[in-house]
Amino acid sequence: MRFLLVIAIVAAIGVSRPVSAAGLERLNYNNPGLNVDLGVGLWAWPLPMDWDKDGDLDLVVACPDKPYNGVYFFENPGNGKGNKFPVFKAAKRVGKAGHNMQVSHVDGEARVLRDGYELIDFRKNGFGKTKKLVPNTKLLEGKTRARMWRYVDYDGDGDQDIVAGIGYWGDLEWDHAYDAQGVWQNGPLHGYVYLLRNAGSDTKPFYMEKEQLKAGGSVIDVYGWPSPNFADFDGDGDLDLLCGEFLDGFTYFENVGSRKNPEYGNGRKMKNAHGDSLVMDLQMITPTAIDWDGDGDQDLVVGDEDGRVALIEHTGRVNGGVPQFLPPVYFEQEASTLKYGALATPFCVDWDGDGDEDIISGNTAGYVGFFENLGGGENPKWARVVNLKAGGRTLRIMAGPNGSIQSPCEAKWGYTTLSVADWDHDGLHDLIINSIWGEILWYRNVGTKGEPKLAAAEAIELEGRMPKPKWFWWDGGEKQLVTQ
């Protein structure tokens, strides 16, 4: 029973279709009226559009992972025009997903592109029919990811050009390049933006050779995963540029030229309207500019690596030429099946001492969550997941600039995996965690059987000199238990 439950939870995402493996089913919340974070599987590529043509914006989200590949439709129930945060219906799979799917809105119609192709009549064809846009779709040689293509009338001449953001990985060289002080010795990620100018028309397009776009006299280069969005963010009538990145932030390039002759100023890392850095909770972010709330300015609908999607609302204000956005707020859906970010690592235990088995789980973001079993026997009713705290703070382990062997580009991942045991033999459940760092940590339960409370982490030490992987740049001491 416990083994099957683990498999089902790891597989769970927020849609109610059975797993295509004999005997396995996703765990349902069995909790009508419960709202949870809207989400798909690993990697969310939001395609906001009026999917069902009922006059409001729905969320269509592409999820290119396995085993839950698909494009999922989250219906906006239409409970009030201008409602920024409707509780979406549970997802319906409406087609197959590929990587790099991006939406463009042309003359009021949603058009979906992936690198080099347009997906034709996608409502009818389940995103399965494509049209090649140019003979050579490979705009940059070498190690590339995040080849993000969109339509935009770049130069205001009335036809749709193509812009493409491309992430380049050739300088990063991926792994094991820290010096003894934990400083990365290889290069960074790059995120470039290219233009394919349409010298024809929309009915008979003819795309010119690629142009690499510049800002402030230098090539536009963000930290990978550029997701370029051209829109009038500052309300002056021309198209500015806003990019995402492989980490969690945004870069803004003001158009200091004109609508027909764009020229971009130096990129500025964005802050929110409160003066703090404008960042998502996780990374590998995929922003799409759209007037989500119908107030006349361009908001951002942004996907995270763990399948969640957030709204970053434009306040309508511009400060020093930079649009002012509110911090992200994550959308919610009607609860369907249990999900905890991506790559969930569930452990079944009676955490709250009430006689039934709950679920404690880690995930890619480095959190540890508690799903409380509210009863129901063989078909339990589950509460919304709660992130655990330790030492009075939300328990979250992240790599930071040097905790992942695979480079600083994994700074916001934690990959928490765990067990629950009475480590100190005091009759209470403690938490034992491994993570992206490879150090085994003990979180002592200093609460009670019915109300667990975790102390701050302590390293686990064993007698004798412990072996340490040769590729570690850091040293936690001779006795500290480390892995990997």
Model-derived segments and spans:
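Bacterial N-terminal signal peptides
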Residues: 4-14
